A protein has these predicted regions:
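Short beta-strand scaffold segments in enzyme catalytic cores
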Residues: 61-66, 178-182, 198-200, 205-211
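Short, internal active-site loops enriched in acidic
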Residues: 122-127, 176-179, 341-344, 373-376
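Active-site nucleophile and cofactor-binding loops and adjacent substrate-binding regions
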Residues: 56, 143-148, 169-178, 198-201, ...
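Short glycine-enriched loops at secondary-structure junctions
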Residues: 67-69, 119-126
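Short beta-strand segments
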Residues: 55, 118-122, 173, 197-204, ...
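ATP-binding/phosphotransfer module of carbohydrate and carboxylate kinases, centering on a glycine-rich
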Residues: 1-81, 85-115, 161, 186, ...
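Glycine-rich phosphate-binding loop and adjoining helix at the ATP-binding site
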Residues: 82-100, 125-197, 215-223, 227-234, ...
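Acidic, glycine-rich loop-and-beta core segments that form the ion-binding/anion-interacting portion
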Residues: 210-262
Length: 387
């Protein structure tokens, strides 16, 4: 036995512990679950206007000109995309190169008028009152020098301005928050109230939630006009019980041992490394999670079984995470605005999440919404236009 199969009781224990960790993060800084305030309310769905958007995730960086209108929007230019330079091999990247490469994706766009900038940045960062954010740590194996504990929006804005773009305002937000905002702009329904969860499960994983400001004890509510706020949980840093010695080995060999334990057990970047710890040399772990899907569906014997167990455990842990967050919400229908290459790329994944949610929280209806491909870009535009 490799310890990858989790019982319903173990999943309930994980969900309950996550609920506790989220409550601690809402109350105080420096907790395992960061619960980073965004100073953004849910959009009404009626926003309109144009914004320049840059979206940098764990795999790709892209730029677009976005035009929003009521409950919809489109890309007027782009997205222009390229692989994120990551510094995973060889020397770490310089910050100038990292941000300059992202700004280059906007080079073909017109520069006929100033536009607000929405920067979707999928790494842990603390929002600041001026719309920027301070990088807390790198995740997903990224290595960039000279950026930790510094603002990330300002250097991108400077690189864009060097290339002739006039920026009228700035808002930095996490990809999970952007996905949530964009999804609500497109799909908001009265039956959900404020019960929305943003979920990213691809190269990395994270959740975003919506909470009454009075629950955010660490936020000065006098400086924020709305009654509720979107919160970037940074849930990938949760340390769940019932992980295995193989998970411990992957963690110890990573560039951030002791952190992002949930992400390392669930997300697309790390699952092949866990497989490699169990069956060394069978696959190249850098080939990605699709290799595990192929092995499960087309392979044979112990290797196929382990690949299937890892993918199923990932989906069941993701469901435990959703149930743990939803336990802090009012009773009622809850929309999960899901995005990510693993979440939708494995044909069995979402159904496993649904089935596990029914086991964990049979009284609550979870509606899993498949997001549009451009939802992060629309969400970043929502944030930029909220200034």
């Amino acid at each position: 036995m490799n310890g990858l199969e989790l019982s319903l009781e173990q999943l309930r224990e994980i969900a309950d512990l996550l609920s506790q960790r989220i409550s601690q993060g809402l109350a105080r800084d420096g907790q395992e679950i960061g619960c980073l305030p965004t100073y953004l309310a849910l959009p009404s769905g009626k926003q309109s206007g144009k914004a320049l958007v840059v979206d940098t995730g764990g795999t790709n960086t892209r730029a677009a000109l976005v035009n929003l209108w009521s409950h919809d929007g489109k890309l007027e230019a782009g997205p222009n995309a390229r692989k994120v330079p990551d510094g995973r091999e060889g020397a770490p990247l310089s910050a100038d190169f990292f941000f300059g490469t992202q700004a280059e994706q906007a080079d073909p766009f017109p520069r006929d008028r100033p536009l607000p900038l929405g920067y979707c940045f999928s790494y842990p960062a603390q929002a600041t009152a001026d719309g920027d954010a301070i990088l807390l740590r790198w995740t997903k194996g990224l290595r960039v020098d000279g950026a930790l504990n510094e603002k990330v929006g300002k250097p991108l804005q400077e690189q864009l301005e060097k290339r002739g773009h006039a920026i009228s305002g700035l808002r930095v937000l996490n990809d999970t928050v952007a996905s949530l905002l964009g999804g609500v702009h497109l799909y908001a329904e009265p039956r959900y109230g404020q019960n929305y969860i943003g979920l990213i499960l691809g190269t990395g994983t994270n959740m975003a939630g919506v909470f009454p400001v009075k629950q955010l004890e660490k936020v000065d509510s006098g400086a924020y006009p709305s009654k509720s706020m979107v919160v970037n949980l940074e849930s990938g840093n949760f340390s769940p019980p019932h992980l295995t010695a193989y998970d411990d080995a992957v963690d110890a060999a990573s560039n951030n041992p002791g952190f992002q334990r949930f992400e390392k057990a669930v997300s697309g970047h790390y699952l092949p490394y866990v497989f490699n710890a169990i069956h060394p040399g069978v696959i190249n772990p850098e080939a990605g999670t699709q290799k595990l899907v192929e092995l499960r569906d087309q392979g044979q014997g112990e290797h196929a079984r382990t690949a299937g167990q890892l993918l199923e455990r990932s989906a069941r842990l993701a469901a435990a995470g959703l149930a743990g967050l939803a336990a802090l919400y009012p009773a009622g229908d809850t929309a999960v605005l899901g995005e990510g290459s693993l979440f939708w790329g494995d044909p069995r994944f979402v159904e496993t999440v649904r089935a596990t949610l029914k086991e964990l929280d049979p009284e609550r209806h979870f509606e899993i919404v498949k997001q549009r491909d451009d939802v992060n870009l629309l969400g970043a535009a929502c944030a930029a236009l909220a200034n």
